[in-house]
Amino acid sequence: MQEPELSVIIPVMNIENRICDVLNTLKEDTKDISVEFLIIDRGSKDKTMQMALRFLRQNQLNGYVMQESGGNVSQVLNAGIQYANGTYITFVFPQRIYQSYLEEFLKKAKETNAEFLFGCKRQEQLKFADLRSTSSVIKQLTGVDYIKCMITHSIIPDAGAVVVSNRFLQNHKIWFNENSTYCYGEDFVYKCFLAANHLAQVAVVMQVDDEKSVLQNQNHTSQDIFAPFEEVECLLRTLVFLQRQYSHHEKMIKLFMQQKIPETIMQIIDGLLKQKVKPRAIRSYMHKKGYDRLLIIGPYTPHTLKAKITTWRYFPKFYRFV
């Protein structure tokens, strides 16, 4: 049997009422592509697996339904990579399904033999994305350049918005970090950008389709209210990796320390405050873990972020009004 052009890895859990909608969307988006669907269940207690299997059979689609009970999302995605037979791989997260992009990505992959493909965040980026792939005059950006763009929000750092060569992942032994519940996708994208020799930005604006995405509860119990700070731990591991392997890229390291990490911490603080967690409790936890020392301000810290950090640090009672 000829290997498919694309393996679509879909981690699912307890979405029996929407799984067929998700698969139907993907069926329409890949109707002109040789594709296999790898639906990996994380231990659903409903009929998600049965519904998915029935959909594949009724529509005569190439694919498998597997169960990885007890595994986190990273473990499920890694299992998908191991089973994937496609020349290229993409990851689809039901809670954020992007508007049709796979056909354009596969077309670009064939034209360029790119190892890692990603889209555009804004309309004005489309022209340059096209020019970079066709013109030798336009500056070709490196993986380090694109990581800087990720940190400054110029591109989307989402593993659910990329297409990557299967062989590239196997050759470079790139996997999702199974020790992290947060930030695993971003960490994966960093690794791909840094390892790939052939990158391609596709002239497609990546937009989440809210109607087709599956709304899932993300509520945390009181005992793990500070669990989002795991994302900071993941970023610290990434920082250590960058410092060891790419210390000569000083601007990227400083952007990571002076913008990425502080910004992430402040976003976590905002989320906790919205959940009515007391500022004193947050500050106490941060001090205990040493996260307060990571709120570094420097030349690469945006002005608005400086204001947020300063207010939180010295005037926490007024922080909600920043």
Model-derived regions: residue spans:
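Short aromatic/hydrophobic "clamp" motif used to bind/position activated sugar donors
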Residues: 89
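Membrane-interface aromatic/basic loop that binds lipid-linked glycans or pyrophosphate carriers
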Residues: 111-114, 272-322
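Catalytic core of nucleotide-sugar-dependent glycosyltransferases
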Residues: 204-248, 267, 274-293
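Donor-binding/catalytic cores of nucleotide-activated saccharide
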Residues: 73, 96-202, 207-226
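A conserved acidic beta->alpha catalytic loop
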Residues: 41-50
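Cell-envelope/extracellular polymer assembly enzymes that use nucleotide-activated donors
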Residues: 5-7, 36, 187
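Short, well-formed alpha-helical segments that are part of the catalytic scaffolds
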Residues: 14-29
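Glycine-rich, basic loop-to-helix element that forms the pyrophosphate-binding segment
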Residues: 68-84
